[in-house]
Amino acid sequence: MSTERDSETTFDEDSQPNDEVVPYSDDETEDELDDQGSAVEPEQNRVNREAEENREPFRKECTWQVKANDRKYHEQPHFMNTKFLCIKESKYANNAIKTYKYNAFTFIPMNLFEQFKRAANLYFLALLILQAVPQISTLAWYTTLVPLLVVLGVTAIKDLVDDVARHKMDKEINNRTCEVIKDGRFKVAKWKEIQVGDVIRLKKNDFVPADILLLSSSEPNSLCYVETAELDGETNLKFKMSLEITDQYLQREDTLATFDGFIECEEPNNRLDKFTGTLFWRNTSFPLDADKILLRGCVIRNTDFCHGLVIFAGADTKIMKNSGKTRFKRTKIDYLMNYMVYTIFVVLILLSAGLAIGHAYWEAQVGNSSWYLYDGEDDTPSYRGFLIFWGYIIVLNTMVPISLYVSVEVIRLGQSHFINWDLQMYYAEKDTPAKARTTTLNEQLGQIHYIFSDKTGTLTQNIMTFKKCCINGQIYGDHRDASQHNHNKIEQVDFSWNTYADGKLAFYDHYLIEQIQSGKEPEVRQFFFLLAVCHTVMVDRTDGQLNYQAASPDEGALVNAARNFGFAFLARTQNTITISELGTERTYNVLAILDFNSDRKRMSIIVRTPEGNIKLYCKGADTVIYERLHRMNPTKQETQDALDIFANETLRTLCLCYKEIEEKEFTEWNKKFMAASVASTNRDEALDKVYEEIEKDLILLGATAIEDKLQDGVPETISKLAKADIKIWVLTGDKKETAENIGFACELLTEDTTICYGEDINSLLHARMENQRNRGGVYAKFAPPVQESFFPPGGNRALIITGSWLNEILLEKKTKRNKILKLKFPRTEEERRMRTQSKRRLEAKKEQRQKNFVDLACECSAVICCRVTPKQKAMVVDLVKRYKKAITLAIGDGANDVNMIKTAHIGVGISGQEGMQAVMSSDYSFAQFRYLQRLLLVHGRWSYIRMCKFLRYFFYKNFAFTLVHFWYSFFNGYSAQTAYEDWFITLYNVLYTSLPVLLMGLLDQDVSDKLSLRFPGLYIVGQRDLLFNYKRFFVSLLHGVLTSMILFFIPLGAYLQTVGQDGEAPSDYQSFAVTIASALVITVNFQIGLDTSYWTFVNAFSIFGSIALYFGIMFDFHSAGIHVLFPSAFQFTGTASNALRQPYIWLTIILAVAVCLLPVVAIRFLSMTIWPSESDKIQKHRKRLKAEEQWQRRQQVFRRGVSTRRSAYAFSHQRGYADLISSGRSIRKKRSPLDAIVADGTAEYRRTGDS
């Protein structure tokens, strides 16, 4: 890469739209380099001189250096980094891991520091300090300290338990042992003693202790089998292999002890599937990639032993690099709740300021002229008002609820357990329960507006069955419609003549077998031979049976189909592949494997036949294959027609083709291929470019059709979610026609749906942009917004758009380098200014076009995006989040869905056939798409209702409690005197009112789960934020204000001129405080009873138990015995017994409670009678509804014959095993069975006439 960057020139993008899809990387992270050179490095000829020449430029990108068996090398001064002041530590981490936060000395200070970083805790700490100032505080210090200690203590105990568990886990892991080369031989050492550069030996079933370079193993060609469940959740075995040179020379202990290889590689990062480096040894350089690295956390399987060199240790390993930087998601209610707390704090400041002004005025008018109020201080009224301001901040501090956040977390934790325990979301077939992987998002499940779903494996089963094929223009398979149930009338094809048949494929077209056996049409045999040879499947034998492991379920189905039709893939080595062709074993030399990726959408293999001919066999999506066909292909149109038929039946298709290659052509191409294979930078891009040169002028053989059935309950689930006003977008890598037909099959699209395509959308967006430009352009930010609709009102519309159209519409075109020449780095101020203005114009235009697209798409009832990459999926989700401010949910099952799952507000992973990456990145997971309706319509809705009720009640009870002080201040000279006993203030939120509201937040439900599913329209209240918003908040505030007025003024009126039974007036302050407190506790607990919709014994016990607990504690605290022990803390001696023995006091309490509650009862009655909600109506008739017959699920059927659409499918978004295969590693016989083996299926019977 040139360093003369100032003179470097590039070309800007073309001004015209380009429909070519941008080749995104599926797994980009923040650790990747932004700018990389595109030049292909020349082929290395493996001699010392060129190795040394290539070593220096390689260091510019690969700066991590490892010397084998040389610990002193890594301790050199230039590898030391300054940690603190003069304390230095090595750049290379040791292998001891530390996941715990605290030790015995740091726990208390660090935990307190972390907790006081939260604003609420810091606020109450400041109040506690203010209470220590006697001139300010009228409250005892413990009124704030006890609640604060409870909150801090609960959190500290939870943190301590978690950290102790981490300590134990770290100790257990760090003390594991393995064998390390020391003093020339292997010795047992603990993991924590391992260092970078050590050579270690691992045995079968051992965990890999660090990221190591595989040097050799007990397997042929040093192949090593590993299980990566701790890394990506996948339990199927993966394959790693060493370099050929290390396999050859590093098998014995003595050679391993003298190994002095030097490695330069990338710095530690979090990319699990990427590694770039070079080994320099024996005067030669060898490129290294991820297939040669064993990562920490893997388990050695089916391999007796292996040797490795430690590259990254401890905190530098990839699994540890991935343990942090988790994206923290917060709910809409979280943000709203925080704003409301800020609002309460502002109200607190204003009330305190007003009362302080009142006190200053009162002091000037009354206090200074009343000799009996003189306290010996000659402070001015304004200064006294200043002190009283802080006094009221303390007295009214309970307006800001200290226990709110702790209570919310407890409720969310309980709701998460309810999801985990729900047996109706348990999938018995795979023993997979639903799992809430986060506890912070439950109520947001009740507010979803848009669902973004993958198709394959999410809506469908991802179990592939070979169904039909088209060979040389002839269609083979079942021609009957799915509605015709006459399978029994046609005999299933008998594959008993084939010794390699697995007996699982159900096929009904006997004519195809006749064609294969007769050999009359050589294209038929060529077709199945291609399926048997063009793949990256791995094979082994178990009990005499062939077991295949494929990179995707599609590929496994195709290889199994070829096996059943007489072309069985038997074995492969570095340079050969062995096929049984109708019982005859033939071995072919493999010259090159052109592997699949999500941008190429195809794979090829180049082989030399035993006769010496060179052939290329290719399979891929029809869109890319047809672009590369030779112009003379007589069956091209017939195959297109067959693809249309397959698409109409929602079958997944791909095309097969081949070409013969001349020896000279291959020799020239192979040189370029070898050069690209050893490139140190941009290796993948270089290989793709070379692949393009050979994959052209192909001859079409035919097409395959694979069935991927819908999961059970998908149409019903989509129907119910649509009735809940949730819009569903399907984002898939499949061909447009396949996705469209699946849309009809799952009833996302109907006969009444008007479908808009990319070209329609483009014209609509262009017209909208013109209108906006005429009104002032994209910069007309201050013009009044004009709400326009893209479509006339009425009608059911859907949008189907491909990834290429999406790029064009959103101005995400691939850069063309043949139009506008510009300087990469402007050298003058004018150039810099012009470039900045150009960027701003383009960005504004892009933003406006994106907004218009989102507005248009959201007017449709359904959206299907086809042929989209993982990055495009995430981009679509982000656009809806950004411009519609709507709550989004993304659901998928594969690694290509991880980006959108992380981008959406809620991510749901389905544990299916494509591993566990989606599940591990998700917030919630389960096994079937149909469980989504229960997650949202039952658990999500319940959680939302419960949280809203909890918050409204919590704010209400705190205002009712606190504002009594406000009213009391008008009668005590605004002196910040409290209206309650100090211990009542301390325990009110902790004991007297905490349990009922917690139980309501955990258990309440307005209607049952069955009725929630039966009436999806109930879900709308969460989408519209009807149960918790600023209006509801101020209603709760007003309710609390009125309650506090009633609770204060009724007892005040009763006490003004009252004589008790003993002839004495009970109008002392302490009796007055007891009366208000008693009425308050009864009122707020009965109020929660009015708010409770679902009664259980636990709810009733908590309400009446809280009231009983209040009276029990009050009588104890007012007893003479406790006053004798703590005279200064308990000063209400005998007050409860003296006051509450007066019938007039009880009458006052009952009157206050009744006046508080009866208006609420009346309003609720009138509201339910005159303006009933949907929930009210269902509750009113719930007995009748419960007695009615439950709705029956409709049988899932595919809707055939909707229209004739051509279909093709995309492979899964991951590479296969081509790198491993071409690196020369034969496959060991002992292997686990194929995970995605083709299941029993029903093939269709179809035969067309001769073309």
Swiss-Prot record:
Catalytic activity: ATP + H2O + phospholipidSide 1 = ADP + phosphate + phospholipidSide 2; a 1,2-diacyl-sn-glycero-3-phosphocholine(out) + ATP + H2O = a 1,2-diacyl-sn-glycero-3-phosphocholine(in) + ADP + phosphate + H(+); a 1,2-diacyl-sn-glycero-3-phospho-L-serine(out) + ATP + H2O = a 1,2-diacyl-sn-glycero-3-phospho-L-serine(in) + ADP + phosphate + H(+)
A Pfam family recorded for this sequence: PhoLip_ATPase_N
Effect of mutating L127P: In PFIC1; loss of PC flippase activity
Binding locations of Mg(2+): D454, T456, D893, D897
Topology of the protein relative to the lipid bilayer: Multi-pass membrane protein
Substitution effect: A886V: In a breast cancer sample; somatic mutation
Chief location bin: membrane
SUPFAM superfamilies: Calcium ATPase, transduction domain A, Calcium ATPase, transmembrane domain M, HAD-like, Metal cation-transporting ATPase, ATP-binding domain N
Sequence positions bearing Phosphoserine: S1223
Record topology, Exoplasmic loop segments: 131-136, 363-389, 971-982, 1055-1068, 1119-1138
Compositionally skewed regions (Basic and acidic residues) per UniProt: 43-54
Enzyme class: translocase
Result when mutating R867C: In ICP1; reduces interaction with TMEM30A
A single GO BP: phospholipid translocation
Transmembrane segments: 109-130, 137-156, 341-362, 390-411, 950-970, 983-1002, 1033-1054, 1069-1091, 1098-1118, 1139-1163
Any one Gene Ontology cellular component term annotated for this protein: cytosol
Family: Belongs to the cation transport ATPase (P-type) (TC 3.A.3) family. Type IV subfamily.
Record's disease association: Cholestasis, progressive familial intrahepatic, 1: A disorder characterized by early onset of cholestasis that progresses to hepatic fibrosis, cirrhosis, and end-stage liver disease before adulthood. PFIC1 inheritance is autosomal recessive.
Biological function: Catalytic component of a P4-ATPase flippase complex which catalyzes the hydrolysis of ATP coupled to the transport of phospholipids, in particular phosphatidylcholines (PC), from the outer to the inner leaflet of the plasma membrane. May participate in the establishment of the canalicular membrane integrity by ensuring asymmetric distribution of phospholipids in the canicular membrane. Thus may have a role in the regulation of bile acids transport into the canaliculus, uptake of bile acids from intestinal contents into intestinal mucosa or both and protect hepatocytes from bile salts.
Name of protein: Phospholipid-transporting ATPase IC
